[in-house]
Amino acid sequence: MTIKKMNVESFNLDHTKVKAPYIRVAGYKDGKVDQVVKYDIRFTQPNVEQMPMRAMHTLEHLLAENIRNYSDDVIDVSPMGCQTGFYMAMMNFDSVEKMSELVEKTLKDVLAAEEIPAQNEVQCGFASAHDLKGAKHYAEKMLAGRDEWDIVFG
């Protein structure tokens, strides 16, 4: 099968060859002074397991809120449409090792969470669609694979 080169970086990634969980640099965007680094934070194996939307939505809230307690370089935390992980955009932050440390600290915060940040109709577009227990399950599962986060292809 010949695969056409696409404009989107992740569409050029062979999802059959990656081994979740992992953290990798998915792209760079250089400005005049600064560099935006996009990270692929993969929780589940593509085309095998997807996180349920409610658990993923809760993880998004917890990750987006709590990771900023550890770094001012965070631009955005975005869920992947395939529901297997998140993209994190960082400013001038080009280190998978340091990113892994940030994610680890933040996932430990998820495990300790007793409430979901911004879970209300004023601050969230689907406030009733959350699952804290499910978010903790996937945080725990991701942390269990911590020693393998630097191994993208398996």
Curated annotation (Swiss-Prot):
Amino acids binding Fe cation: 57, 61, 124
Disulfide topology: none
UniProt record, GO biological process: quorum sensing
GO molecular function, one term: S-ribosylhomocysteine lyase activity
Cofactor(s) needed: Fe cation
Comment on bound cofactor: Binds 1 Fe cation per subunit.
Catalyses which reaction(s): S-(5-deoxy-D-ribos-5-yl)-L-homocysteine = (S)-4,5-dihydroxypentane-2,3-dione + L-homocysteine
Keyword vocabulary terms for this entry: Autoinducer synthesis, Iron, Lyase, Metal-binding, Quorum sensing
EC class: lyase
EC number of the protein: 4.4.1.21
Pfam families the record matches: LuxS
NCBIfam families, alphabetized: PRK02260.1-4
Function description: Involved in the synthesis of autoinducer 2 (AI-2) which is secreted by bacteria and is used to communicate both the cell density and the metabolic potential of the environment. The regulation of gene expression in response to changes in cell density is called quorum sensing. Catalyzes the transformation of S-ribosylhomocysteine (RHC) to homocysteine (HC) and 4,5-dihydroxy-2,3-pentadione (DPD).
Oligomeric and partner information: Homodimer.
Family, per entry: Belongs to the LuxS family.
HAMAP family the UniProt entry points to: LuxS
Protein name (record): S-ribosylhomocysteine lyase
Species annotation: Exiguobacterium sibiricum (strain DSM 17290 / CCUG 55495 / CIP 109462 / JCM 13490 / 255-15)
Gene name of this polypeptide: luxS
